[in-house]
UniProtKB/Swiss-Prot annotation:
Domain of life: Bacteria
Protein's UniProt name: Protein YoaG
Subunit structure: Homodimer.
Gene name linked to the record: yoaG
UniProt cross-references to InterPro entries, sorted A to Z: YoaG, YoaG_sf
Disulfide bonds listed in the record: none
Gene3D superfamilies hit by this protein: YoaG
Species: Escherichia coli (strain K12)
One Pfam family from the record: DUF1869
């Protein structure tokens, strides 16, 4: 039996693009700097798929 993984997902509702971050240690996300970096990376990845309607995506 494998280790449990936990997933953080960011989705752009205007175009349906979704990106995930998986971790086996969700407690690390309680560290504000770590959580901010994870979310920033996810948002930037989602944003890279939206070239025409940038105002529809959460800016960072």
């Amino acid at each position: 039996m494998g280790k449990a993984t936990y997933t953080v997902t960011v989705t752009n509702n205007s175009n349906g693009v979704s990106v995930d971050y998986e971790t086996e240690t969700p407690m690390t996300l309680l560290v504000p700097e770590v959580a901010a970096e994870v979310i920033k990376d996810l948002v930037n990845t989602v944003r890279s798929y939206d070239t025409e309607n940038e105002h529809d995506v959460c800016g960072w």
